[in-house]
Structure formats: structure tokens, C-alpha cells
Curated annotation (Swiss-Prot):
Name of this chain's protein: Large ribosomal subunit protein uL2
Gene name in the database record: rplB
A Pfam family this chain is assigned to: Ribosomal_L2_C
Assigned protein family: Belongs to the universal ribosomal protein uL2 family.
Entry GO MF terms: rRNA binding; structural constituent of ribosome; transferase activity
Superkingdom in the source lineage: Bacteria
């Protein structure tokens, strides 16, 4: 994949950097692997907003992805690499020798015609899936299961990869993209290689309208609201917060307050916590 930068012919193209989609080999998805998807728009089953700044956006059809890789010991071949509007990673259409078709996440380095297979004793090649206990130390993996047979739950984003760093009894230690080291049961499946389309981190939407196409609505700072709408609101002009620190719209302390539950069941499986980011991310905005 490559990226394409635009000249500033208009304000919307001044900062625009997008994928060139050179790796896409098919424009129409496989109809048998499509299902309709209802957009929740940030609402729960009662219609109450549980996630702000969501709504609108282009209609999408969900592509059924094979995260389980449970078609064991049946060779398959990648026949196309496609765009998926529901994720940053590309997806690959696989034809298996028994005639079945499935979508998988496209690993970095594969192309049309690459053979893949899933099983306990498969070759250590990009795109193949196998239990963690059979993967050599130092190998890069993605689409990792946390519960055997449930399907991959972590390391699925574009460009993401984990590394097998140790094997201890019934567990395998993985170094995750966040630098956290976590123990996973040895019988859990993982796919060899990293997820493709890593250059997506270098892209830029360029204008607010493209954000709306993705279903993201504007985020209004609390300091420009009225006191009835946000604890930061009110005052004359650009007034300070008036508190010891920033808070959420519901008065809970923000920016630095730990949100992970104490005595969580998975605490015993985490050997090393992820390091704190030196840069302030989305949470650094005036909530």
C-alpha cells in the first residue's frame, strides 16, 4: 500500500492524505458473505445516548470475517484483496479446496495466489493459523484468541502485531502492540504475521466532512458550553475551569484518573503493564 498527498487546490485538499488503494484487486464484495448492519448511532436498546459524537455516515454492509480460522487442515488460496468499510485493515477472499469461501484479515506481505492453511501442524508462514504452543519464540502474530475456539479478539487493527516472547506451562506470553506482556492459553489460535495496511497511520482526513462520512459527529468543548450543559461551562469570555482539575460532563475526574477495575479477573494474566504514552491523546482535549 502507498499513500497519496494532495496539493492545496481547495481547503479540503490542503491537509488531505489518503491511501492509493493500489493493493485492492476487486471492487465488488462476495454477496454470500454480506449481511445488513443496523447503525446504532451511539444509542442503547432504550434509545439513550451511551456514546456521544456518533451518528450519520454512509450506509455499510457487514463483511463476515473468519476470526476463528476453524477450517482446519484444508488448503486455501487468496483470490482477492478487498476494501472493508468497517475496519482499517484490508480483507482477503479465500477459496478453499472444498469449495467454501471465507474472508480473513489481510496479513502484511501476502498477495493474490498466496496459499494459506489453518491447523495444529502447519508451516510457519504468513497467513497460516495454528495454536500458540506450536509457534516459535520471537514470531510475529495477529488475530489472537483469548478463549480457545472463540475466535481472534486482540491484535486485529491495521498494522498491529504481537510477538511470542515466552512459554510457561499452559500459557504463552505475548508482547502486545501496547507493550503490555500478557499470558494466553497455549491452545489458543493465532495467525502468523502482522496485519497489513500499516500506512493508515500516516493518512489524514483533511476536512470535517470526511469525518461525517465515517459516522463521527462534532465534539464540542465543555468550556464553550453553558453551566447547565457541562461543569466547565459558563463564565465571562474564556474563563478557566474553576476546579482543581478537568472533569467529564458528569463531574467525574478526567485526564489521569485510572479507570480499570480493581481485582479484575485477568490481572493474574498480565505480566507487565503497558507503558504510559508521552503524548496526550484524545483524552487530552477539554472534555
Amino acid at each position: 500500500m502507498g499513500i497519496r498527498a494532495f496539493r492545496p487546490y481547495t481547503p479540503g485538499t490542503r491537509e488531505r492524505v489518503v491511501s492509493d488503494y493500489a493493493e485492492i484487486t476487486r471492487n465488488e464484495p462476495e454477496k454470500s458473505l454480506l449481511v445488513s448492519k443496523h447503525r446504532r448511532k451511539g444509542r442503547n436498546n432504550r434509545g439513550v445516548i451511551t456514546c456521544r459524537h456518533r451518528g450519520g455516515g454512509h450506509k455499510r454492509l457487514y463483511r463476515i470475517i473468519d476470526f476463528k480460522r476453524d477450517k482446519r487442515n484444508v488448503p486455501g488460496k487468496i483470490v482477492s484483496i478487498e476494501y472493508d468499510p468497517n475496519r482499517n485493515a484490508r480483507i482477503s477472499l479465500v477459496y478453499y479446496e472444498d469449495g467454501e469461501k471465507r474472508y480473513i484479515l489481510t496479513p502484511a506481505g501476502v498477495h493474490v495466489g498466496t496459499p494459506i492453511i489453518a491447523g495444529d501442524e502447519t508451516p510457519i508462514e504468513v497467513g497460516n493459523a495454528m495454536p500458540l504452543q506450536n509457534i516459535p519464540l520471537g514470531t510475529t502474530v495477529h488475530n489472537v484468541e483469548l478463549v480457545a475456539g472463540k475466535g481472534g479478539q486482540i491484535v486485529r487493527a491495521a498494522g498491529a502485531s504481537a510477538q511470542v516472547v515466552a512459554k510457561e506451562g499452559n500459557y504463552v506470553a505475548l508482547k502486545l502492540p501496547s507493550t503490555e506482556v500478557r499470558l494466553v492459553r497455549k491452545e489458543c489460535y493465532a495467525t502468523i504475521g502482522a496485519v497489513g495496511n500499516a500506512e493508515v497511520r500516516n493518512t489524514s482526513l483533511g476536512k470535517a466532512g470526511r469525518k461525517r462520512w465515517l459516522g463521527r459527529r462534532p465534539e464540542v468543548r465543555g468550556s464553550v458550553m453553558n453551566p447547565v450543559d457541562h461543569p466547565h461551562g459558563g463564565g465571562e469570555g474564556r474563563a478557566p475551569i474553576g476546579r482543581s482539575g478537568p472533569v467529564t460532563p458528569w463531574g467525574k475526574p478526567a485526564l489521569g484518573r485510572k479507570t480499570r477495575k480493581k481485582n479484575k479477573q485477568s490481572d493474574c494474566l498480565i505480566q507487565r503493564r503497558r507503558r504510559k504514552s508521552s503524548k496526550r491523546g484524545r483524552g487530552g482535549r477539554d472534555a
